[in-house]
Curated annotation (Swiss-Prot):
The species this protein was found in: Xenopus laevis
Keywords: Differentiation, Spermatogenesis
Function statement: Essential for spermiogenesis.
A Pfam family of this chain: Meiosis_expr
Membrane-spanning residues: none
GO biological processes: cell differentiation; spermatogenesis
Keyword Repeat attributed: no
GO cellular component, one term: nucleus
Lineage: Eukaryota, Metazoa, Chordata, Craniata, Vertebrata
UniProt keyword Oxidoreductase, yes or no: no
Annotated family: Belongs to the MEIG1 family.
This protein's name: Meiosis expressed gene 1 protein homolog
Length: 88
């Protein structure tokens, strides 16, 4: 099984905000588990990111609608525990 076909072995909920949690939040609001699933579904090598922060800049949903994100944090504190962290 290649990395692009990997299925998660487990899932936990985020406890506190971090850069990783911010990016997971962005993927999940666009309808994907994480970057692994996004890259597999959309067949892309790179995800658009803000150079200053490294946060995801733009994602395309499965219905081809684009989501655009700001340079700054978008995952509010009350949303952190809704973010799912997958382990492969």
């Amino acid at each position: 099984m290649s990395a692009s076909e990997a299925k998660p072995k487990s899932m936990t909920r985020a406890k506190q905000w971090s850069d990783e949690i911010e990016n997971l939040y962005r993927f999940q609001t666009a309808g994907y588990r994480d970057e692994v699933e996004y890259r597999h579904v959309k067949q892309v090598e790179m995800v658009d990111r803000w150079p200053e922060t490294g946060f995801v800049k733009k994602l395309q949903r499965k219905d081809n609608t684009f989501y655009y994100y700001n340079k700054k944090r978008e995952c509010e504190e009350k949303e952190v525990n809704k973010v799912k962290v997958y382990a492969y």
